[in-house]
Amino acid sequence: MARIAGIDLPNNKQLQIALTSIYGIGRARALEICEKTGVLPDKRAKELDNDEVNKLRKIIESDYVVEGKLRSELAMSIKRLMDIACYRGLRHRKGLPLRGQRTKTNARTRKGKRKTVANKKMASK
């Protein structure tokens, strides 16, 4: 089982798909990595030899920001927005959509489950 960037690649999948199990690598980037290293993207992960795994590991660690470092960079950029109190930072802090979507209705994913107002039905009668 190949281990790259702290992640065990799934053995039975093609390399181009197996690489997407690493956070920060999608299909396009996986194909790009395969092209740089000269490894066939259709090859199964279990068929890789140590030399090919080392090539992949070297390219990924040197050229790309993946896994924990990428997660921390994203968290730091969001924290920076909140610290400078710009519009996007305030929206992050309040848990509302950032990019101009309506919030009177919809926006349920960002706002979370509905918070019901107690006794609203009884008061209206």
Curated annotation (Swiss-Prot):
One annotated Gene Ontology cellular component of this protein: cytosol
Record flagged with keyword Ribosomal protein: yes
Region described as Disordered: spans on this chain: 97-125
InterPro entries xrefs: Rbsml_uS13_C (IPR027437), Ribosomal_uS13 (IPR001892), Ribosomal_uS13-like_H2TH (IPR010979), Ribosomal_uS13_bac-type (IPR019980), Ribosomal_uS13_CS (IPR018269)
Origin superkingdom: Bacteria
Keywords for the protein's UniProt record, in alphabetical order: Ribonucleoprotein, Ribosomal protein, RNA-binding, rRNA-binding, tRNA-binding
GO molecular function: rRNA binding; structural constituent of ribosome; tRNA binding
GO terms under biological process: translation
Gene3D superfamilies tied to this protein: 1.10.8.50, 30s ribosomal protein s13, domain 2
Alphabetized Pfam families for the sequence: Ribosomal_S13
Function recorded in the entry: Located at the top of the head of the 30S subunit, it contacts several helices of the 16S rRNA. In the 70S ribosome it contacts the 23S rRNA (bridge B1a) and protein L5 of the 50S subunit (bridge B1b), connecting the 2 subunits; these bridges are implicated in subunit movement. Contacts the tRNAs in the A and P-sites.
Annotated NCBIfam families: uS13_bact (TIGR03631)
Oligomeric form and interacting partners: Part of the 30S ribosomal subunit. Forms a loose heterodimer with protein S19. Forms two bridges to the 50S subunit in the 70S ribosome.
HAMAP family for this protein: Ribosomal_uS13 (MF_01315)
Family: Belongs to the universal ribosomal protein uS13 family.
Protein name listed in UniProt: Small ribosomal subunit protein uS13
Native species: Borrelia hermsii (strain HS1 / DAH)
